């Protein structure tokens, strides 16, 4: 009886010690408050939400996602308040019910940690694994002339690789006309832009496996970087037939948040390029995905179609990954939108030279936020 009492006492003491260790400690990196802002670009009306976290020591960190609801913000701030920014991995797990907002919070917490350490985020994460980041220009959907014009603008802005939309099939299993139209599009673009131009063909998960197979065969000799989201991830057997019988690399992943679906693709050897959505997964989660991908010789090219804060996070993520491939970046058509993005977060952030984005050596994410452009506060 006495021994049992002693064991229970020791167990109770151990539990109390663990609880004390887990309790948030006050300090300059303790999160004091959080605010969010809805941002809209002036011409395109592209929308995204920017999160601002501030510590008790006055350090401000920034993150971004697509949208932030007031109720979700209140819930997130309740989780974050009083916690240390260095607990970003733990807090990422505790915000699992708020996937979009936790991605933004993860960026902001790492921004704070980097500023406190007086080091870029990629150094905090063990980088840099590279000193510049290959850039992919996102080309909006349109007819052949519109796509060519957008690619020419992007090339003039420094891009040498492009994510182009596939010509949509007229119907399911469209056959030869669909294949011919896509082959012509890629051939025309390469002829107009130069042999040093590379292309990712974005199918937006809109094709049947049969159409995707026909397209993959037709584009093989044109050497696209990869075929992006050729079909929905509903039948691993169908994707396996597509991946196993063709040479054109396949990219999947923008719809995946949990690791289970990604592990299925890896286990069956169905993927060449992993495309996690940065605005939904955040830096920490994608680094976990990337470690799994590296062990299976799969490259990582995060999906990003948001604002410049997300671009900054993407660059630091890229410079922390050994198996990073390329980073897509939105390219606004309107000069006013380009100026807006440059003024919002820093003029040099999205500047591309000979196909590459530069890494900032500034602490944290290296942002220079103009608060006057943040738009309406979420409340």
What label would you give each PLM region?
Residues 1-22:
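N-terminal export leaders
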Residues 6, 15-16, 27-39, 43, ...:
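Flexible C-terminal active-site loop/helix
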Residues 54-119:
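Metal- or metallocofactor-binding catalytic centers and their adjacent structured scaffolds
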Residues 58, 105, 118, 162, ...:
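Conserved, mostly hydrophobic/aromatic
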Residues 65, 102, 178, 201-208, ...:
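Glycine- and other small-residue-rich loops at beta-strand/loop junctions that grip anionic moieties
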Residues 71-74, 82, 89, 234-356:
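Shared catalytic-loop signature of beta/alpha-barrel
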Residues 105-142, 146:
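Glycine-rich, aromatic-flanked loop segments that form ligand/cofactor-binding clefts
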Residues 131-246:
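Metal-dependent enolase-superfamily TIM-barrel catalytic cores that perform enediolate-based chemistry
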């Amino acid at each position: 009886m006495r021994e049992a009492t002693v064991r229970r006492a020791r167990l109770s003491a151990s539990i109390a010690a663990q609880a004390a260790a887990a309790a948030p400690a006050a300090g300059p990196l303790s999160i004091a408050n959080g605010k969010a802002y809805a941002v809209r670009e002036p011409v395109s009306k592209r929308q995204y939400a920017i999160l601002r976290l501030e510590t008790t020591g006055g350090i401000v960190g920034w993150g971004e996602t697509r949208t932030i609801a007031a109720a979700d913000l209140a819930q997130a701030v309740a989780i974050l308040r009083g916690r240390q920014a260095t607990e970003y991995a733990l807090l990422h797990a505790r915000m699992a019910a708020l996937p979009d907002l936790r991605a933004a919070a993860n960026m902001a917490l790492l921004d704070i940690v980097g500023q406190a350490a007086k080091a870029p985020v990629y150094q905090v994460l063990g980088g840099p694994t590279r000193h510049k980041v290959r850039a992919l220009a996102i080309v909006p959907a349109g007819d052949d002339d519109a796509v060519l014009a957008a690619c020419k603008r992007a090339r003039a802005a420094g891009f040498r690789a492009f994510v182009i939309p596939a010509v949509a099939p007229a119907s399911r299993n469209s056959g030869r006309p669909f294949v011919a139209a896509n082959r012509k599009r890629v051939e025309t673009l390469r002829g107009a832009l130069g042999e040093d131009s590379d292309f990712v063909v974005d199918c937006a998960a809109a094709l049947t496996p049969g159409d995707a197979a026909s397209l993959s065969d037709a584009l093989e000799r044109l050497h696209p970087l990869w075929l992006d989201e050729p079909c929905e991830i509903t039948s691993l057997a169908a994707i396996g037939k597509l991946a196993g019988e063709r040479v054109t690399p396949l990219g999947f992943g923008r719809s995946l948040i949990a690791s289970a679906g990604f592990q299925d693709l890896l286990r069956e050897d169905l993927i060449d390029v992993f495309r996690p959505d940065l605005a939904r997964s955040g830096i920490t989660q994608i680094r976990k995905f990337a470690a799994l991908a590296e062990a299976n010789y799969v490259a990582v090219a995060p999906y990003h179609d948001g604002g410049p804060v997300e671009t900054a996070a993407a660059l630091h993520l890229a410079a922390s990954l050994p198996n990073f491939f390329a980073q897509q970046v939105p390219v606004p058509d309107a000069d006013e939108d380009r100026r807006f993005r440059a003024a919002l977060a820093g003029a040099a952030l999205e500047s591309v030279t000979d196909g590459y984005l530069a890494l900032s050596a500034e602490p944290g994410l290296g942002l220079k936020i103009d608060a006057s452009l943040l738009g309406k506060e979420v409340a």
